[in-house]
Amino acid sequence: MEPFVVHKGKVAGLDRANIDTDQIIPKQFLKRIERTGFGQFLFYDWRYLSDGTPNPHFELNRPENEGATILVANENFGCGSSREHAPWALADYGFRAIIAPSFADIFYNNCLKNSLLPIKLPKEDVAYLLKQAERADYELTISLEQQVVFDDEGFTSSFDIDPYRKQLLLKGWDEIDLTFVYEPYIIAYEKKRS
């Protein structure tokens, strides 16, 4: 996994609440187990019209949102069924962070396990970011180390994150990588027991 220390990127806004995992990645695209290739199906039912052409009215299809790496949405993002494919699709599309007032618990944890940073900010800060995201050139900087989000215009907001998850993200590790850190101790223990 790629470490997340500081990230500066273009912001796309999706001013909707209760975006569920079936909207993030519809069930018909869940037939694979690899973590890549899901970005093309992200928000599929919103991004494409019934004839398969891109929906020009959907936020992420607008030219000004091309290349966005930070998504700002409203409360209860990632609700619905537990599917790890949802953070896979968001990450594969190119997002490094999702900012919202609240997240569904399982989705939030699935993001952290897949190097996608979910950031909870106050509603008024999210409202400001959604308004700013209407501009084609709006960028944010996220410092995970300092636990702060800021722009070049004076906006700043801090966020909380579990210290254990923070360290894994900073190092670009998942739980398996962490196990390898303790491998010498595991081997020594096994030798002692045999």
Swiss-Prot record:
GO MF annotations in UniProt: 3-isopropylmalate dehydratase activity
Enzyme Commission number, as recorded: 4.2.1.33
Reaction it catalyzes: (2R,3S)-3-isopropylmalate = (2S)-2-isopropylmalate
Keywords: Amino-acid biosynthesis, Branched-chain amino acid biosynthesis, Leucine biosynthesis, Lyase
Residue ranges crossing the lipid bilayer per the database entry: none
Pathway given in the UniProt record: Amino-acid biosynthesis; L-leucine biosynthesis; L-leucine from 3-methyl-2-oxobutanoate: step 2/4
Domain of life: Bacteria
Any one GO biological process: L-leucine biosynthetic process
InterPro entries: 3-IsopropMal_deHydase_ssu, Aconitase/3IPM_dehydase_swvl, AconitaseA/IPMdHydase_ssu_swvl, IPMI_Swivel, LeuD
GO terms for cellular component: 3-isopropylmalate dehydratase complex
Purpose: Catalyzes the isomerization between 2-isopropylmalate and 3-isopropylmalate, via the formation of 2-isopropylmaleate.
Family to which this protein belongs: Belongs to the LeuD family. LeuD type 1 subfamily.
UniProt-listed NCBIfam families: leuD (TIGR00171), PRK01641.1 (NF002458)
Cited PANTHER family: 3-ISOPROPYLMALATE DEHYDRATASE SMALL SUBUNIT, 3-ISOPROPYLMALATE DEHYDRATASE SMALL SUBUNIT 2-RELATED-RELATED
Subunit organization: Heterodimer of LeuC and LeuD.
Full protein name: 3-isopropylmalate dehydratase small subunit
Native source organism of the sequence: Anoxybacillus flavithermus (strain DSM 21510 / WK1)
Phylogenetic classification of the source organism: Bacteria, Bacillati, Bacillota, Bacilli, Bacillales
Gene name of the record: leuD
